[in-house]
Amino acid sequence: TICDGETFNIQPTDNSPTEIVPVGTTYSWSAPVSNPAGAVTGGSEGASQASISQILANITDYPASLTYTVQSEYNGCKGEPFEVVITVNPTVGVDAIADQTLCNGDNTLAVNFSTTLSNNSNNVDEGEISYSWQNDNTDIGLAASGIGNIQSFTATNSTTGPITANITVTSVYTYNDVSCDGESATFSMTVNPSPLVEFSEDDQFITSGDTTVPVTLSSPTDGVTFTWTVAAEDGITGLTTTSGTDTIPAETLFNTTTEPLTVTYTAIATGDVGFDCEGLPTDYVVTVNPLAQVNPVNDQVVCNEENLLIEFTTNITGGTMTYTWT
C-alpha cells in the first residue's frame, strides 16, 4: 500500500529452494488493471525490467488498487506468471473553516474538522481520516500544534493592537496501516486587545470648595472611544456632570462632613468598529478633604508666673491636623 503520487518498487528476492530468483532476472507485464476501473492512473505495461516500479495516482476519495500480472525471465527461460497488487490511498482535503475574530478574554468557538468525500458508489473499503494542525502564533492562547479538533479556549492578547494566528490543518488518510498526508486548509484567529484607559492627571486631593483640574482620557490602543460615570459619597455637593466621554471636566466640590470623602470616576475604553472590545473599568479618584476647623477655646485667667497650657482640638477626622497661632 502506498500514498497517492508515490512510487512503489518491488524487487523479488531469492528464497531457495522454493523460490529461486537468479541474479539478472527481468520482469515484464501487461497493462495493469485498476479496481475500481479508472481509479488509479500511472500504471502501464513494462518489458525486461530489473524490478517492478511505477508512480501511481489515485483520482478518487477512497482506496483503490492496481493489479499487475508479471512474467519473469532469465536467460530466455520464463517463470510462472504472478500477480502484484498495489493499493493506493487517496489524497483527501479539509473542508473550509471559518475565521474567528475575538476580544481578549473571549472563549473561542470550538473548531471541528471535516472532509467531504464523493459518493462511495463502488462500496470499497474506507480508511480513517484524522487531522493535525500547526499554529504560527501561540500568543493567542493556543498551542503550537495538535492532533484532532480544537476545543474552545480563552483567547488572549496582552498587547495594545490586534494579533492574528494562522492555523494550518492537514488531513491524514490511513488504510492498511499506511498513513498519507492529504491537502491542507488554513484559517485565522484574530484576537483584539482590551483597550486600557490612561488619565492625564494623577488622582487629585482637594479641599472643600476647591476646583479640580480637568482630566483627559487616552489609550495606548488606537481608535478607541471612552465613556465614564461618576459616583460620589454622601456629603459631596457641587457635581454638575454625571457621565461623559474623553474628558472629565473641572468641578468645584464641597465636603459637608468632617471627614475626607471621595468622588470616583469609572472609565471604560471601547475599540472602534473594527474590534468592538471593551476594556476593564478603570477608576479615577478625587478626594475632597473637609475645611479645617478648630473647636472653640475657652478663655483662661491665670496668676503671674503660673504655667499656661492651651490645647487645640477639632472634630475633623481622617487625617492629621496641625495648628498655627499668632
Regions found by a protein language model. Give the residues of each.
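Extracellular low-complexity Ser/Thr/Asn/Gly-rich intrinsically disordered segments
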Residues: 1-326
